[in-house]
């Protein structure tokens, strides 16, 4: 697969730091961010690269040449083959694509030259190949979805809506944001070449929403643009600390698996109405701390109300949108939500017989945790299962996780759990931020 890197922008928001450097040449721990991008591509077998340049183009072209030389910073070979397209006039972030389409004969990876990423590109490419479509977006949750563009998708990851910052949005929504990495088909570039500047998102990709030809690939991996001095400083620290590299799914991850009812939200029995969903005190702060400490936050919840015919999948999705929205308002996010819709007991009015089965996903069965572990390359022995019931503890035990039982009142039962805490907030403060959280990192 060929990679196209858009490196022609002026970087006006970060001009005070960049000075006479094009933004892709800003150093991250001693190496230009563009060099780090090329290194990540090379390590994963992507060695055919086309870079579009414009503002201060010679600084990029003289540093990297055709890719056959060595880095002036490290002395190591670049190890890639580089071609260039020079914008004679600003063409927006996609105008150059139409002018290089004769060099693109298969689906290609499209990157921004000022974005720091550390992701498993092979997983991304495999998803795109399996699902087809004209374009796949790399999407992830963030700590400020309320002022970010949002991607809405169906259960097959087909994008149904693309909500820009300016668009009206629903009261509740999934925390899914376009990260700025794409895999595109050259078929998108057929037809007349547009005049002037072309906006990739608004003119090319957003119109595909709802057609079935635009997919989104959800991942917790590190992708961050460095378009402001504050973001640039944060990226530098994330690279120096190892946080960026640790999130790559080629490396083993550690997770906190979370029950939902009674752990995240107030327990009301069978939760059937979205208005009954209410975050427990301290939960948003706890999940935010899980995010900050580098653990994946994964919800695994039994929802027999589906099998009972009392809640539809669409209604459950709305409840989970509310959960993500409330967490997002406090700067917290979930990396994934898994639910089991089944229940083994049959013979009740209104039930859905096809879901009244014995399954491998209903806790204490391990199915949801195993699915998450495969998807995110999770080391279960380094992870925690946290919940307020026996089935939560047993599910964790069944996959080799450490377990924590939440018990706000009375004496907690002894179920073999490693820790007991009054709330999720207390668990995070006592365990993840303490010695036990450190020893398995």
Per-region residue spans from a language model:
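Acidic, Mg2+-coordinating phosphoryl-transfer loop and its flanking beta/alpha structural elements
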Residues: 384-421
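Conserved Lys-Pro-Asp/Glu-containing loop-to-beta segment of HAD-superfamily phosphomonoesterases
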Residues: 109, 352-354, 360-390
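Conserved N-terminal catalytic core of the sugar/cofactor nucleotidyltransferase
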Residues: 2-5, 27, 31-113, 121-123, ...
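Catalytic-core segments of class I nucleotidyltransferases/pyrophosphorylases
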Residues: 108-109, 116, 122-129, 140-145, ...
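Active-site neighborhood of HAD-like aspartate-dependent phosphohydrolases
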Residues: 253-297
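A short, conserved beta-strand element in the Rossmann-like catalytic core
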Residues: 91, 115-118, 223, 263, ...
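N-terminal nucleotide-binding beta1-loop-alpha1 segment
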Residues: 1-19, 44, 251-261
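Substrate-recognition element of Asp-dependent hydrolases with the DxDx(T/V) motif
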Residues: 52, 283, 287-323, 330-347, ...
């Amino acid at each position: 697969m060929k990679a196209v890197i858009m490196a022609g922008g002026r970087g006006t928001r970060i001009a005070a730091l960049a000075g006479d450097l094009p933004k892709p040449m800003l150093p991250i721990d001693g190496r230009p961010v563009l060099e780090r991008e090329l290194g990540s591509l090379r390590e994963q077998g992507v060695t055919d690269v086309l870079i579009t340049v414009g503002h201060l183009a010679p600084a990029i072209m003289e540093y990297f040449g055709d890719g056959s030389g060595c880095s002036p910073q490290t002395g190591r070979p670049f190890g890639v083959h580089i071609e260039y397209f020079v914008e004679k006039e600003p063409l927006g972030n996609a105008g150059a694509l139409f002018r290089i389409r004769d060099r693109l004969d298969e689906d290609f990876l499209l990157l921004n030259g000022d974005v720091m990423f550390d992701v498993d590109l092979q997983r991304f490419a495999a998803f795109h190949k399996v699902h087809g479509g004209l374009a796949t977006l790399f999407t992830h949750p963030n700590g400020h979805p309320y002022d970010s563009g949002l991607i809405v998708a169906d259960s097959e990851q087909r994008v149904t809506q693309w909500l820009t910052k300016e668009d009206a949005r629903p009261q509740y929504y999934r925390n899914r944001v376009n990260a700025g990495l794409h895999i595109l088909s050259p078929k998108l570039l057929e037809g007349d070449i547009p005049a002037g500047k072309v906006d990739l998102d608004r003119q090319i990709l957003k119109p595909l929403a709802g057609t079935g030809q635009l997919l989104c690939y959800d991942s917790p991996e590190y992708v961050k643009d460095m378009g402001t001095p504050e973001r640039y400083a944060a990226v530098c620290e994330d690279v120096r600390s190892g946080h960026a590299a640790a999130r790559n799914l080629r490396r083993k991850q550690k997770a906190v698996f979370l029950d939902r009812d009674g752990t995240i939200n107030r327990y009301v029995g069978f939760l059937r109405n979205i208005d009954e969903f209410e975050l427990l005190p301290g939960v948003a702060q706890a999940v935010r701390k899980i995010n900050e400490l580098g653990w994946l936050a994964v919800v695994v919840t039994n929802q027999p109300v589906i099998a009972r015919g009392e809640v539809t999948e669409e209604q459950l999705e709305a409840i989970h949108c509310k959960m993500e929205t409330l967490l997002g308002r406090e700067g917290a996010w979930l990396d994934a939500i898994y639910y089991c819709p089944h229940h083994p007991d049959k013979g009740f009015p209104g039930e859905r017989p096809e879901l009244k089965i014995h399954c491998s996903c209903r806790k204490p069965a391990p199915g949801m945790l195993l699915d998450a572990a495969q998807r995110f390359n999770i080391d279960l022995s380094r992870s925690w299962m946290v919940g307020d019931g026996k089935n939560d503890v047993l599910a964790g035990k069944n996959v080799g996780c450490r377990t924590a039982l939440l018990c706000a009142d009375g004496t907690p039962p002894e179920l073999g759990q490693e820790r007991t805490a009054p709330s999720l907030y207390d668990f995070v403060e006592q365990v993840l931020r303490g010695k036990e959280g450190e020893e398995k990192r």
